[in-house]
Curated annotation (Swiss-Prot):
<dbReference type="InterPro" id="IPR013087">
    <property type="entry name" value="Znf_C2H2_type"/>
</dbReference>
<feature type="zinc finger region" description="C2H2-type 2">
    <location>
        <begin position="89"/>
        <end position="111"/>
    </location>
</feature>
<dbReference type="GO" id="GO:0003700">
    <property type="term" value="F:DNA-binding transcription factor activity"/>
</dbReference>
<keyword id="KW-0862">Zinc</keyword>
<dbReference type="GO" id="GO:0003677">
    <property type="term" value="F:DNA binding"/>
</dbReference>
<keyword id="KW-0539">Nucleus</keyword>
<keyword id="KW-0479">Metal-binding</keyword>
<dbReference type="InterPro" id="IPR036236">
    <property type="entry name" value="Znf_C2H2_sf"/>
</dbReference>
<protein>
    <recommendedName>
        <fullName>Putative zinc finger protein 818</fullName>
    </recommendedName>
</protein>
<keyword id="KW-0804">Transcription</keyword>
<comment type="function">
    <text>May be involved in transcriptional regulation.</text>
</comment>
<comment type="similarity">
    <text>Belongs to the krueppel C2H2-type zinc-finger protein family.</text>
</comment>
<keyword id="KW-0805">Transcription regulation</keyword>
<dbReference type="GO" id="GO:0005634">
    <property type="term" value="C:nucleus"/>
</dbReference>
<dbReference type="GO" id="GO:0008270">
    <property type="term" value="F:zinc ion binding"/>
</dbReference>
<keyword id="KW-0863">Zinc-finger</keyword>
<keyword id="KW-0238">DNA-binding</keyword>
């Protein structure tokens, strides 16, 4: 049932939305490679390709500002901070703020002199940074 719904949503013959053009070209090459396989009928390949295209669209997150396509929602959240200017991680030592926790942890080396902060220290620093950023 789901298979039938996915293939009816978009057929390979329909023009694709602009952001999928390069994806469609790559999938067309994949389709030609599948055509060479004797065990797979042409209609099966088209169904497979349309499922891949629909899966690509459904599984990816699209930012509403710049149109960048990202593979995971967490990446989308981090990327959107570029547009909003939100910096959730604030250093309690110097007040410098960061959009990503990993960059904040790397910054802490400036204050601690440690090359590899231990795991408990990292968790404590992230908590402090988030708390200071939220109470700002």
């Amino acid at each position: 049932m789901l298979e039938r719904n996915l293939t009816s949503m978009m057929s390979v013959e329909e023009p694709l939305p602009r952001p999928l053009t390069s994806l469609y070209i790559r999938l067309s090459i994949l389709e030609r490679n599948h055509m060479n396989m004797t065990y797979m009928a042409k209609s099966s390949v088209k169904i497979h390709i349309s499922k891949v295209i629909i899966g690509f669209v459904l599984k990816r997150s699209l930012t509403n500002v710049c149109g960048k396509v990202l593979s995971q929602n967490s990446h989308l959240v981090n990327h959107q901070r570029i547009h909003t200017g939100e910096k959730s991680y604030r250093c309690h030592e110097c007040g410098k703020a960061f959009t990503q926790g990993s960059r904040f942890i790397n910054h802490q080396i400036v204050h601690t002199g440690e090359n590899f902060p231990n795991v408990l220290n990292v968790a404590r620093l992230l908590r402090m940074a988030l708390n200071s950023g939220l109470t700002k």
